[in-house]
C-alpha cells in the first residue's frame, strides 16, 4: 500500500478557531484555547496518522498588527510556515465580515507558491444565506484550491476537510512515529496548560502580559507523583497581586484547574507548585523572550 504524507499550515486572524480545529482533529487538547485574542504564541504541530497517511498540521499564532517584540515573533512564526508546508488552510469566521486583517493575509498568500484551501469556520453561528455571502466575498479575493465550510467546535464537515487533504497528499515518508501527536516536549505543554488557566480566569491586560516557565519536572519516588515547579511571569506588581488573589485564592484556583488537565495529559498524579514573579516589560526584551520560550531560532 502506498503511504502518503504532507505538511499543512493553519493560518488566520486571532480567535477564528484554529486551535479548536486542531484539537478536534487530534481528538485531544494539544493547543490551548481561550476567548482572548493571540492565545497561541508558538507554532504547534499536530500529527495526524492513519495506516495510509500522515498529515502534519501546524497551528500558528493569529496574525495581527504587532505592538511588541512578542507580537513580531508571533506574526513571523505564522508567516514562516508558508516556507515549510505543502498546503495552507486559511481559516476565517463565518460570523464576521472580511476585514483588513484578512486582506493582509490574502496578499501574503497570493505571493506564496502553495495551494490554499479557504476554511470558513463557525458555520453553526450563521444562517445559510449569510454563509453563502461570506463564501462569495472571499472567493472574489483570490483563487482558492477548495472552499470548505466547517464548525470546528461541533465537528461539522471536519472529516470532509480531512478527506480533501488526504486526496491531495503525495506519496511520502512517515515523518513521525504513529503514536506521536505533537513535536513539543511535555514541559511546553505543561506551561501552556497553566497559561490557559490564567487566560480563562483573568481579564484586562493580564492575559497578554503572562508567560509561564516550567522550572523543574520530575517524579517523586516516595509519593509516585510527578512534581512540577512552574513560575508565572508578569510585567507589573499589580498584575502579580491579581494573579495571586486574596489570600492566594486565585493562584490556588489556577493551579488546581491546570493540575487536572496536566494529569489527564500525562496519565499520572501531579503535584504542582506555582509561583508568580515580575519581569518588567519582558515582551519587548529579546533575551527574556528567548528565556520564556519565544525563540527566533524556531523559524
From Swiss-Prot:
**Domain Era-type G positions:** 4-171
Q: How does it sit in the membrane?
A: Peripheral membrane protein
Sorted alphabetically, the Gene Ontology cellular component annotations on this record are: cytosol; plasma membrane
Q: What is its main location?
A: cytoplasm
Q: Which stretches of sequence are listed as region G3? A: 59-62
Q: Which GO terms describe its biological process?
A: ribosomal small subunit assembly
Q: Does the keyword Methyltransferase apply?
A: no
Region of interest (G5), ranges: 150-152
Keywords carried by this UniProt record: Cell membrane, Cytoplasm, GTP-binding, Membrane, Nucleotide-binding, Ribosome biogenesis, RNA-binding, rRNA-binding
* Molecular function GO terms recorded: GTP binding; GTPase activity; ribosomal small subunit binding; small ribosomal subunit rRNA binding
Q: What Gene3D superfamilies does the database record attribute to this sequence? A: 3.30.300.20, P-loop containing nucleotide triphosphate hydrolases
Region annotation G1: where it falls in the sequence: 12-19
Segments of this protein annotated with the region G4: 121-124
Where is this chain's protein located in or outside the cell?
Cytoplasm; Cell membrane
Source species, domain of life: Bacteria
Q: Where are the transmembrane segments?
A: none
Q: Per its UniProt record, what Pfam families does this chain match? A: KH_2, MMR_HSR1
Per UniProt, GTP binds at 12-19, 59-63, 121-124
Q: Where is this region: G2?
A: 38-42
Q: Where is the KH type-2 domain?
A: 202-280
Q: Which HAMAP family match?
A: GTPase_Era
The family assignment reads: Belongs to the TRAFAC class TrmE-Era-EngA-EngB-Septin-like GTPase superfamily. Era GTPase family.
* Job of this protein: An essential GTPase that binds both GDP and GTP, with rapid nucleotide exchange. Plays a role in 16S rRNA processing and 30S ribosomal subunit biogenesis and possibly also in cell cycle regulation and energy metabolism.
What is the annotated quaternary arrangement, including any partners?
Monomer.
By what name is this protein known?
GTPase Era
**Per the UniProt entry, what species is this protein from, by scientific name?**
Streptococcus sanguinis (strain SK36)
Amino acid at each position: 500500500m502506498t503511504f502518503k504524507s504532507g505538511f499543512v499550515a493553519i493560518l488566520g486572524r486571532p480567535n477564528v478557531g484554529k486551535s479548536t480545529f486542531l484539537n478536534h482533529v487530534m481528538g485531544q487538547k494539544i493547543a490551548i484555547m481561550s476567548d482572548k485574542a493571540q492565545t497561541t504564541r508558538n507554532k504547534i504541530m499536530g500529527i495526524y496518522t492513519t495506516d495510509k497517511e500522515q498529515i502534519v498540521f501546524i497551528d500558528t499564532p493569529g496574525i495581527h498588527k504587532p505592538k511588541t517584540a512578542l507580537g513580531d515573533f508571533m506574526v513571523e512564526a505564522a508567516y514562516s510556515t508558508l516556507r515549510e508546508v505543502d498546503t495552507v488552510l486559511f481559516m476565517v469566521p463565518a460570523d464576521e465580515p472580511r476585514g483588513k486583517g484578512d486582506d493582509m493575509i490574502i496578499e501574503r498568500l497570493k505571493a506564496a507558491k502553495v495551494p490554499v484551501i479557504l476554511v470558513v469556520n463557525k458555520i453553526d453561528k450563521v444562517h445559510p444565506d449569510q454563509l453563502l455571502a461570506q463564501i462569495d466575498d472571499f472567493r472574489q479575493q483570490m483563487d482558492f484550491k477548495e472552499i470548505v465550510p466547517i464548525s470546528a467546535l461541533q465537528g461539522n464537515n471536519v472529516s470532509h476537510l480531512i478527506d480533501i487533504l488526504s486526496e491531495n497528499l503525495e506519496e511520502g515518508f512517515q515523518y513521525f512515529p504513529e503514536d506521536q501527536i505533537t513535536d513539543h516536549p511535555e514541559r511546553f505543554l505543561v506551561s501552556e496548560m497553566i497559561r490557559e488557566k490564567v487566560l480563562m480566569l483573568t481579564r484586562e491586560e493580564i492575559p497578554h502580559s503572562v508567560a509561564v516557565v516550567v522550572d523543574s519536572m520530575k517524579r517523586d519516588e516516595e509519593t509516585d507523583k510527578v512534581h512540577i515547579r512552574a513560575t508565572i511571569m508578569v510585567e507589573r506588581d499589580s498584575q502579580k497581586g491579581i494573579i495571586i488573589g486574596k489570600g492566594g485564592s486565585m493562584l490556588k484556583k489556577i493551579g488546581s484547574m491546570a493540575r487536572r488537565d496536566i494529569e489527564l495529559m500525562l496519565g499520572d498524579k501531579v503535584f504542582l507548585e506555582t509561583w508568580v514573579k515580575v519581569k518588567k516589560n519582558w515582551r519587548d526584551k529579546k533575551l527574556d523572550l528567548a528565556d520564556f520560550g519565544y525563540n527566533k531560532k524556531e523559524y
